[in-house]
Amino acid sequence: MSRRTRAQKRPTAPDPVYNNVLVNMLIQRVMRNGKKSLASRIVYEAMKTVQERTGEDALQIFERAVKNATPLVEVKARRVGGATYQVPMEVRPDRGISLALRWLVQFSRKRAGRSMSAKLANELMDAANETGSTIRKREETHKMAEANKAFAHYRY
């Protein structure tokens, strides 16, 4: 077991446009090679596209997409007597949001299309409507946990 103390969670600053912590977290996930201005431009363009296409507030749709994509349970590998079991565990709220944002960006990148902002906008709208690859990933995670319910007593 590690003797080091657990690192303190630093508070995340809200983004300048929407004054929202979640939007800033999304910008951080979209960012590559430290290019934050490019990442923020991509996210804000995606939000503008969502607003134009749906006619609703982009921030509400984004928050609904994150809420829909957040997993409640996941499986973790645990070795017991030479065998590795997939043990279902509840997901902490901060980890759930982190996974949801990670999946949104990951599946946006895999989408066919020209610009990242358009792909991100489409993925956000799909997730808000409970469709798309991100939601499929969450359902897959829940199914894995359900299938391995028998090993729940190995929880740690």
UniProtKB/Swiss-Prot annotation:
Family annotation (CDD domains): uS7_Chloroplast
SUPFAM superfamilies for the chain: Ribosomal protein S7
Source superkingdom: Bacteria
InterPro entries: Ribosomal_uS7, Ribosomal_uS7_bac/org-type, Ribosomal_uS7_CS, Ribosomal_uS7_dom, Ribosomal_uS7_dom_sf
Cystine pairings recorded for this chain: none
Transmembrane spans: none
A GO biological-process term: translation
UniProtKB keywords: Ribonucleoprotein, Ribosomal protein, RNA-binding, rRNA-binding, tRNA-binding
One term under GO cellular component: small ribosomal subunit
Pfam families xref list: Ribosomal_S7
Molecular function terms, GO-annotated: rRNA binding; structural constituent of ribosome; tRNA binding
Subunit structure: Part of the 30S ribosomal subunit. Contacts proteins S9 and S11.
NCBIfam families the UniProt entry points to: rpsG_bact
Entry similarity comment: Belongs to the universal ribosomal protein uS7 family.
Primary role: One of the primary rRNA binding proteins, it binds directly to 16S rRNA where it nucleates assembly of the head domain of the 30S subunit. Is located at the subunit interface close to the decoding center, probably blocks exit of the E-site tRNA.
The name this protein goes by in its record: Small ribosomal subunit protein uS7
Source organism per UniProt: Thermosynechococcus vestitus (strain NIES-2133 / IAM M-273 / BP-1)
